[in-house]
């Protein structure tokens, strides 16, 4: 009996979703796993992070070798994104199978066999008959060219360049399996279009039911030289069909379609699944990013790290949650922020909340199921891009054409709807965390709006960014509404149920872009918070030094040099500095209306009240020392605060930045050093949006991947032991 693991065949080092008979290249049923559930389960083994690392490694390879069974979403994303460099190679071993199905169609037609789409009309009009097979294919492409370019208008209704390249790759992969009845030379021509960066213009208008008929017909139109065909050249210029062929180095002229070939080109789900592949590559990266951002959020918010304890998550059983918690635990383990926060939490514990708010404390429980959804969708789309989606299917071994419905793109529509829901929920978490971060009622001492200027009345920090985040989140949540519940009966009620796969993919692509906007804004805010914690530590250090100096100078001795009762106040005065949030008073540290001076005075008053009879003696009265202490503090403290700020701004702070020794440092370094962003203040000209723009562009270009993975480079794939 063959095991499930053995059922996953290997090709070029990648797992195949098909089990093949090497002798005749026909599908066979695996007796150990006849329904493919075992193969699906096997594909989910290992951690999500390891899978993302494999995806990134695969994405960066210079060649994609197509054989019909081992295409991955990362390969699709690579071809889609890399206009130059990554090349497609076709497996020569597939040529014989492709030719056999093509020959079968011609022989069948010559014998007078009645076959759908070869001798019949299409869809609801399949009762019509013709013997003009080539003319029928030509008409198929003509009537499916029903899209609208919108020439002369501001809006363009062509699909993105990346989506078209992805669609061409996926369609080639499907056709290579030899069940479609098309010449190998046509697949080679499409490959040349990809490799020479010539991209047909595809239009909207598909319900992904009998495949993506309308957009795919524009690829067929270009291959056959239709006069309305357009393509983008290597520099983005618009080309007609003849120019496109010249640019792609296709030298044999336009194709005269043989029977079934037009149908083979258009009757597939490649546009929806191609775009879905691009979406899911990005979604997987954003999912890992959200885990690391949540950990950094816990660091700058001085959160309690016990929310990542493995026992909590082990008892919940969900693998996505367990992994999310373990990743956050890894980031927080040994973090200087966590160590400092622990000391703060031990100070007056009964006067502080026992636990953090949900956006921090339940982030693993929130993200875990979303990661599972994205991962399952990834595997579903990976199966789809390795599927044969034609109708009819040409079964050469049994000498028959099978009429079915593999063109129904339900796996795409459902996977994309689910992915969009997951993206919206990730966005909601980031927004909740962002809202806590900028609110001084919740953020454990950071300034309101993360303002960093000397004068908070002229610096409103991330207030505009919070409004933008609310806008992004609202739009993202609107997009989370399902597409697949909006099916309309089409094509004379023949296509009465249809998947809407491409529409759902397009909406999910929009959701990806919005989540990238949110992730960019949030990470810039987190870096601002990191720098503010650094500034806070330096300022507090300076305030403590000055308070200590002034206390020693003014409170230790009396007028005649004798030891004074007020000498015992210093410890309590420094405790006030430790307890007070620096940014609550630092813009005017000696103001009588701010908490620092009020509470320092209260310490002296409290000591005076217990000084008893000694207060009646001017030489031993603590009350008499208060004015002297405050006057000297007012003289020294503002100067020291300004000096500390100046040293910080010049890059010479007394206390180094804690982030430098943390596992989250690679992301911070990337944002600050590689992208050249800095601490935002109202005193500077640069706006928050300009800094967010730099990071957004970097995320879209994939530049954040390496620093993100570096944060987790030494994670062993397991939670810390329960101790």
Curated annotation (Swiss-Prot):
Ranges in coiled-coil conformation: none
Catalytic activity: L-phenylalanine = (E)-cinnamate + NH4(+)
Single annotated GO MF: phenylalanine ammonia-lyase activity
Family: Belongs to the PAL/histidase family.
Function: This is a key enzyme of plant metabolism catalyzing the first reaction in the biosynthesis from L-phenylalanine of a wide variety of natural products based on the phenylpropane skeleton.
Pfam families, alphabetized: Lyase_aromatic
Top-level taxonomy: Eukaryota, Viridiplantae, Streptophyta, Embryophyta, Tracheophyta
Free-text description of this protein's post-translational modifications in UniProt: Contains an active site 4-methylidene-imidazol-5-one (MIO), which is formed autocatalytically by cyclization and dehydration of residues Ala-Ser-Gly.
UniProt name for this protein: Phenylalanine ammonia-lyase 1
Name of the gene encoding the protein in the UniProt record: PAL1
GO cellular component term of the entry, any: cytoplasm
Keywords: Cytoplasm, Lyase, Phenylalanine catabolism, Phenylpropanoid metabolism
Primary location class: cytoplasm
E.C. code: 4.3.1.24
Gene3D superfamilies per record: Fumarase/aspartase (Central domain), Fumarase/aspartase (N-terminal domain), Phenylalanine ammonia-lyase 1, domain 3
Tissue: Present at high levels in roots, with slightly higher amounts in roots with nodules than those without, and at moderate levels in stems. Low levels also present in lower leaves.
A GO biological-process term: L-phenylalanine catabolic process
SUPFAM superfamilies for the chain: L-aspartase-like
